[in-house]
Design a protein with these regions (language model features):
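Soluble extramembrane regions of membrane proteins in the secretory/endomembrane system
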Residues: 1-58, 388, 392, 404, ...
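Short, surface-exposed, charge-dense and proline/glycine-enriched linear segments
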Residues: 4-10, 28-30, 34, 66-81, ...
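Sequence-level detector for tyrosine residue identity
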Residues: 5, 49, 53-56, 226, ...
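Generic structural signal for short, solvent-exposed loop/turn connectors between secondary structure elements
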Residues: 38-43, 81-86, 258-262, 368, ...
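Structured alpha-helical bundle/scaffold domains in large eukaryotic membrane-trafficking regulators
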Residues: 42-43, 64, 119
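Hydrophobic transmembrane alpha-helical segments in integral membrane proteins
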Residues: 57-70, 133
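Alpha-helical transmembrane segments of integral membrane proteins
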Residues: 69-359
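Extracytosolic and intramembrane catalytic regions of membrane-associated proteins
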Residues: 298-487
Length: 487
């Protein structure tokens, strides 16, 4: 559960070997493969890899082009014996898959836009993820279920089946050209399917038996559903554009099997299941103790200011226990003078009068192109981190921290490029000596802030009001004291 990442739930008790950090789905089969391998054998060269139903598959990167060629030859061999027709084959290898993916993708995004408007947020890891999976899967499969009978009446089964896998081969080839290391994600399904279709085409089987055994190709394309499920679990539903195409690829391969008297019933079921998934996604709770809302309490204090501010950094609407607390509004304002990302859920508070961080200029002398500054920084409240935010006038500065060379780096993406920052972690009560060479010859006005994870008493009520279905994330609960400095 990556919902637990950087939260109090990020513990061994919640460890799942399938989703360790971001690539646990590959880590577990890799560990099994290594345990059964001869590790004394030398290995050179780049390899590409993929997890296949819990098994580890890898081959030299240079072999991908050969495997693509083998898959193409097998599909050609299958087409020689399978009734298809060149025109219909081309149609089902290009236009039909594109139509199914476009219709399904449009439907998915429209459904999730409606859900976001109703729920107020798209939750990456909701309490009941299966309801949202119902929406994604049914929306992507619905065009295939509705249009499948229409294709059956006009296009031979062989053209529908081979066309779908030629589309996947073309897609694999395109991925190989632009991102060769990503091609195995498709090739692990295309190659065994091409082999199966070629074998079925050349075996002396009755057409009915051949068509029946061809349904085994769905076992290969089901790998795409596996990929969609893993992406939703490890990256969250907010990466929706990376999830639904995998379900769409399964739909492209499955449309050939939408036929017979039951196809109309299947389409009707799909039409009914989609609104059912929508209703469940709207009415069931978005958060639970196992999959909580990410909500951190921030205390912000500008030195010598008459009042401080409280900020609730939350994904989505505030919990009822906190939404009614006085002073918080949905009006968006910048958190800091140097930031340029207005955020809601802020309120004025009585200042706890925490001591501000200190800065002492130990040296200030001119150098070629600017000035050399030696600064001594300190958190007067033993905070964990110091941040020095420099204005654009400092130019492309360089320097060192305790003798370690540093270069100018950009501030967070949430802050304007008019400022650059220097963050020093693990400070606590120590003096930090910084040497900077700036391009400015005149006075510089900067900001100095320190960050701790101990909230003052003024914020204790908010922390206590946070329900069990909400937890702090990333920085967690944070107290920031900042001041303007000139040197």
């Amino acid at each position: 559960e990556r919902n637990h990442y950087h939260t109090p739930n990020d513990s061994p008790a919640n460890l799942d070997p399938r989703t360790v950090q971001h690539h646990g789905d590959n880590l577990f089969p890799l560990a099994l493969w290594l345990a059964n391998s001869d590790l004394s054998a030398a290995h050179t060269g780049r390899v590409v890899y993929a997890g296949v139903y819990g098994l580890w598959a890898q081959w030299p990167q240079s072999a991908t082009a050969i495997l693509l060629g083998v898959a193409a030859l097998l599909l050609i061999a299958a087409g020689l014996r399978w009734e298809a027709g060149a025109a219909m084959l081309v149609l089902h290898a290009t236009l039909v898959p594109g139509l199914l993916l476009a219709l399904g993708g449009l439907l998915v995004h429209q459904c999730f836009e409606l859900l976001e408007r109703t729920n107020g947020v798209t939750v990456g890891w909701p309490a009941h993820p299966w309801t949202f999976r119902i929406v994604i899967w049914s929306a992507m499969l619905l065009p295939a279920l509705v249009l499948g009978p229409l294709f059956q009446q006009r296009v031979p089964f062989g053209a529908r089946l081979l066309g779908a896998w030629w589309f996947l081969w073309l897609l694999s080839f395109g991925v190989f050209l632009f991102a060769p290391d990503a091609a195995p994600a498709l090739l692990i399904a295309v190659l065994p399917t091409a082999l199966l279709l070629a074998v079925l085409a050349w075996l002396p089987l009755p057409p009915a038996w051949r068509d029946l055994l061809s349904s085994l190709t769905l076992a290969a394309s089901a790998l795409f559903l596996y990929a969609a499920t893993l992406l939703g679990a490890t990256q969250g539903l907010h990466v929706l554009p990376a999830i639904w195409p995998w379900v769409g690829l399964f739909a492209v391969t499955a449309v050939a099997f939408v036929r017979g008297p039951g196809s109309g019933l299947a389409a009707l079921v799909g039409i009914l299941v989609l609104p059912l998934g929508m209703l469940l996604s709207i009415n069931l709770p978005l958060y639970s103790e196992q999959r909580p809302q990410h909500l951190s309490v921030w205390y912000l204090q500008e030195a010598d200011a008459p009042a401080a501010r409280l900020h609730l950094q939350a994904a989505g609407d505030l919990p009822p226990t906190m939404a009614g607390m006085s002073g918080f509004t949905d009006r968006r304002e910048n958190l800091f003078p140097w930031s340029d990302e207005p955020r809601p859920h802020q309120a004025e508070a009585v200042s706890a009068e925490l001591p501000a961080p200190s800065l002492l200029v130990e040296e200030d002398r001119p150098v070629a192109g600017g000035r050399r500054l030696r600064l001594r920084l300190r958190s007067e409240r033993d905070a964990a981190m110091l941040r020095l935010v420099l204005p654009a006038a400092a130019g492309d500065w360089t320097g060192d921290v305790e003798g370690v060379p540093i270069n100018r780096g950009p501030v967070d993406g949430s802050e304007t490029q008019e400022f650059t920052q220097l963050r020093v972690h693990g400070v606590q009560g120590r003096d930090v000596r910084i040497t900077l060479e700036v391009e400015s010859t005149g006075p510089l006005t900067a900001w100095l802030a320190d960050y701790s994870h101990t909230l003052p008493a003024i914020a204790e009520g908010l922390r206590m009001a946070r329900p069990a279905t909400a937890v702090p994330q990333h920085w967690g609960d944070t107290a920031v004291v900042y001041r303007e400095v000139t040197f």
